[in-house]
A protein has these predicted regions:
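P/S/T/G-enriched low-complexity
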Residues: 1-352
């Protein structure tokens, strides 16, 4: 059967904390051009450490050793395997009484630490997702048109135009803004969407409530300003198609706020906005890029909020008896029995 067309809104966190590293760093090894190695090459490289790569792809730090009394000293290079009292010396090549003599011929490596920021990980994951949607749309049995829109959220101020703008002040924080209206996910559309993703830079707060407001605007095809107090028709927003399944995907590194730390009011407002989306048939996914993200936890504020926004809890609300948003009155309701809609991603591999 033909795949249902999708209208997807990606709601992306571009707060300043998205510039932080995600997970553990990795090492990148680069082969050197030099092939002839002496004791002095290794012992004299104060600022450079060299590594030997064995047949199994393991890397070991190369060390310089000398043995014997002065005038009869033997020089060698090699590496240790094992640890503690069980270290074994693995000599490379031969020994020599001349510390400048060539002892071994072969390739050694240098290394550098590679870190991935949350923003880089999100960009990689989102671009991979866009490619996957395009592949699905172009499948032999799935000749269907999917569309994707991009919303960024950061500061508690809107830019009432489509684009990627920042405030004109010292901090240059991101506006919360519709970056791309619904774009058909074909070859040209993929280039437009991935280009827009790559252009995002982190700066600002974590106003996820503003981001969800704009997601609703995109789906409705009209702007909502000043927290929903009035509406403006705008023909530049195409709105969702009646025959399309509507999906919102929220990427964030945690702490909903208009400044710092976990803001109860922002979290409550976000849960209520998500409730309205879900009540109108929109499926909402959340992806948590923060330490201790755990979809099975509904006690911790972060995880409770992420679950409440997602379709894990379709009836979640955070409203007091006066109809006001209140985190103290957050009620998740009953969890769905099928499907998962909140995912934890604490390193780049999980995001992919």
């Amino acid at each position: 059967s033909k795949t249902t067309p999708l209208d997807i809104v990606l709601v992306l966190d571009v707060s300043g904390s998205m510039d932080d590293d995600l997970g553990e760093s990795t090492w990148e090894y680069t082969p050197t051009d030099e092939q002839r190695w002496s004791y002095s090459d290794i012992n004299g490289s104060r600022w450079t450490t060299y590594y030997f790569r064995d047949d199994d792809g393991n890397y070991y730090e190369v060390e310089a050793e000398s043995d014997g009394s002065w005038g009869n000293r033997q020089y060698s290079i090699g590496y240790y395997t094992g640890s503690g009292f069980y270290r074994d010396w693995n000599q490379l090549g031969t020994t020599s009484r001349n510390q400048n003599a060539n002892l071994w011929t072969g390739t050694l490596y240098t290394r550098q630490e590679i870190t991935t920021s949350k923003m880089e990980a999100m960009q990689s994951a989102v671009n991979g997702f866009i490619d996957q949607v395009a592949e699905n749309a172009a499948g032999a049995d799935n000749d269907v048109t999917h569309r994707i829109s991009i919303v960024k959220f950061a500061d508690d101020s809107y830019a009432d135009s489509v684009g990627n703008d920042r405030q004109d002040d010292y901090y240059a924080y991101n506006y919360t803004q519709i970056v791309k209206d619904f774009t058909t996910v074909d070859a040209a559309g993929v280039q437009q969407l991935t280009g827009a993703i790559e252009a995002l830079e982190p700066a600002g707060a974590t106003s996820v409530d503003y981001g969800l407001t704009l997601a609703q605007d995109v789906l409705d095809g009209q702007w909502r300003h000043d927290g929903g107090e009035w509406w403006v028709e705008d023909p530049t927003l195409t709105g969702a198609r009646q025959d399309a399944k509507q999906v919102v995907v929220v990427f964030t590194d945690g702490e909903p706020n208009h400044g710092n730390d976990f803001d109860d009011d922002v979290a409550a407002t976000a849960v209520n906005l998500a409730h309205d989306l879900k009540n109108n048939g929109v499926t909402v996914y959340t992806i948590g890029m923060f330490e201790d993200a755990d979809p099975d936890d509904i006690r911790d504020n972060f995880n409770k909020y992420m679950n409440g926004v997602s379709s894990n809890y379709p009836n979640a609300t955070a409203t007091n008896r006066f109809g006001q948003a209140s985190w103290n009155f957050c009620n998740l309701g009953t969890r769905v029995t099928e499907g998962n809609y909140y995912f934890a991603a604490d390193d780049a591999e999980e995001l992919e």
